[in-house]
Amino acid sequence: MKSKGSIMACLILFSFTITTFINTETISAFSNQVIQRGATGDDVVELQARLQYNGYYNGKIDGVYGWGTYWAVRNFQDQFGLKEVDGLVGAKTKQTLICKSKYYREYVMEQLNKGNTFTHYGKIPLKYQTKPSKAATQKARQQAEARQKQPAEKTTQKPKANANKQQNNTPAKARKQDAVAANMPGGFSNNDIRLLAQAVYGEARGEPYEGQVAIAAVILNRLNSPLFPNSVAGVIFEPLAFTAVADGQIYMQPNETAREAVLDAINGWDPSEEALYYFNPDTATSPWIWGRPQIKRIGKHIFCE
């Protein structure tokens, strides 16, 4: 009995030691400091990278704890039910971050040392998260612009379904009601159309009207593709799919132009020429998106297969 008791005591002590070691290792991924707004250094780099891994932080990983990092921390704390939602990164927040994310330190530090533009999102291979060289960017842009100049007869004609714009003598309210009645296709609800308009407004306001229709068309093309979710909301809110969702602009009030662009896309106008992807060449950092076969450029966006 004494021997068995000794063995049990040793097992308990061993378990306690292992648990303590694991918890210590978990915390030690960061230093012991409480990270807060205004902080700089490696702790902040890791913080930003881990937050970006799960999509909470979409800014530059630069080791400077500014307002963007602050709100990302608060959103993370709130999402995971932490007691303190205050932007202060103490032991509990660090533990939760380590549990819910990954940090590829060597990759991040290499990119910072080289001065590269890069990201650290989860579920995307790291080799696709470093912005290509200026030479590669310029070459791809020139190719897209060259293709844009080629005749594309199938997209130059706008469908006649939008001919109601010439009815200037009809009251605006009546025209709006007529457009909804005439253009609302089966299978799309008012909520679908509003959500599409919010996405178009968040992604492409200020772009040429053709470019706004093209954004709506890309969403519809994804809806019809087996590679993407089978609902409007599913496509739009798919993780990392749209910048407007990541930065909250999806919730802005869309204007009538965005709504009209959605209706034109639903009625068959596809200036994107069946594109499934698009990106802004001035801000895109992913070699993966740059490597997609490019169809054309409209305004600030390049549309891809």
Swiss-Prot record:
Residues 130-185 are annotated as: Disordered. B.subtilis SleB could not be detected with anti-B.cereus SleB antiserum and vice versa. GO terms for biological process: cell wall organization; spore germination; sporulation resulting in formation of a cellular spore. Belongs to the SleB family. InterPro entries: Cell_wall_hydrolase_SleB, Peptidoglycan-bd-like, PGBD-like_sf, PGBDSf, SleB_dom1, Spore_cortex_SleB. It is found in: Forespore. Residues 158-172 have a biased composition (Low complexity). It comes from the Bacteria. Pfam families: Hydrolase_2, PG_binding_1. Residues 142-156 have a biased composition (Basic and acidic residues). Keywords: Cell wall biogenesis/degradation, Germination, Hydrolase, Signal, Sporulation. Residues 1-29 form the signal peptide. Its main location: other. SUPFAM superfamilies: PGBD-like (SSF47090). The gene is sleB. This is Spore cortex-lytic enzyme. It comes from Bacillus subtilis (strain 168). Induction: Expression is sigma G-dependent. The keyword Nucleus does not apply. Could be a lytic transglycosylase. Required for spore cortex hydrolysis during germination. Interacts strongly but noncovalently with spore components.
